[in-house]
């Protein structure tokens, strides 16, 4: 159909009866926003949401009036993913991540330590187009899976819907040291599903494209080390400047005597 994006579609999964028992939604979350001063990344547009709601209503009607249980996959995560987190306390800053876009002034940690690995602030759009609320309205989406943020594999429920990140699985884009992974999603005929993460190292594989240090530290540790080095550098420069200023001031006083 003539709607925003190139890959908005769904795939019904039939059970033993030959009738659809489950559904998989695939949405095109596009690329950059038309005005990057407002938002770096694009949104799911209103015409895409309308298409989803119309198709969901059609599937509901064909399913005797009950929502057809579904999972949804798209690249850019929804802004509601930040509801899996809370603002970091001062003593938690060492493990916190900086928010993205209009949330950049805040630092976050996961609310639940069992929600996976958070290594960077989710790079969601700064504009909330109402996609998540649309899922709640239609009642069919049980879980949504995202890419985009290469180092995160967090997963947790927001208002009864699982929001899960899929970490990068390769080494050619920025990644998390030797820890790329895949997320396995298993759907059962009763409409339930489960998901798990399996990393490159779980399979006892050795990456030949990473150096010995890169294999042993995560990107997050590398970022922390860079921040620490920068902080030490700034501290040293500040101390040197202050010391130099102090000496200059003393010299000036001596000359005045």
Language model features with spans:
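Binuclear metal-dependent phosphoesterase catalytic core
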Residues: 10-18, 116-117, 122-138, 150-229
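Active-site-proximal segments of metal-dependent phosphoesterases and phosphodiesterases across multiple
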Residues: 65-139
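Hydrophobic alpha-helical topogenic segments used for membrane insertion/localization
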Residues: 227-252
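Intrinsically disordered, highly charged
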Residues: 254-257
């Amino acid at each position: 159909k003539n709607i925003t994006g190139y890959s908005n579609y769904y795939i019904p999964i039939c059970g033993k009866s030959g009738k659809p028992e489950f559904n998989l939604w695939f949405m095109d979350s596009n690329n950059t926003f038309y005005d990057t001063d407002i938002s770096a990344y694009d949104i799911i547009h209103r015409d895409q949401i309308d298409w989803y709601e119309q198709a969901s209503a059609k599937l509901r009607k064909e399913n005797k009036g009950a929502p057809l249980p579904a999972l949804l996959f798209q690249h850019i995560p929804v802004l509601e993913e930040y509801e899996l987190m809370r603002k970091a306390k001062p003593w938690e800053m060492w493990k916190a991540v900086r928010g993205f876009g209009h949330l950049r002034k805040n630092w976050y940690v996961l609310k639940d330590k069992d929600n996976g690995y958070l290594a960077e602030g989710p790079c969601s759009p700064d504009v909330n187009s109402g996609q998540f609320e649309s899922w709640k309205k239609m009642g069919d989406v049980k879980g949504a899976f995202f890419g985009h943020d290469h180092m995160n594999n967090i997963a947790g429920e927001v208002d009864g819907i699982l929001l899960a990140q899929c970490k990068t699985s390769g080494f050619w884009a920025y990644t998390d040291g030797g820890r790329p992974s895949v997320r396995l999603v298993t759907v059962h005929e009763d409409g339930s599903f489960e998901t798990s993460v399996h990393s490159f190292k779980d399979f006892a594989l050795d990456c030949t494209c990473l150096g010995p240090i890169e294999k042993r530290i995560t990107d997050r540790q590398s970022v922390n080390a860079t921040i620490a080095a920068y902080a030490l550098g700034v501290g040293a420069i500040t101390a040197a400047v202050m010391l130099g200023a102090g000496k200059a001031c003393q010299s000036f006083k001596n000359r005045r005597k």
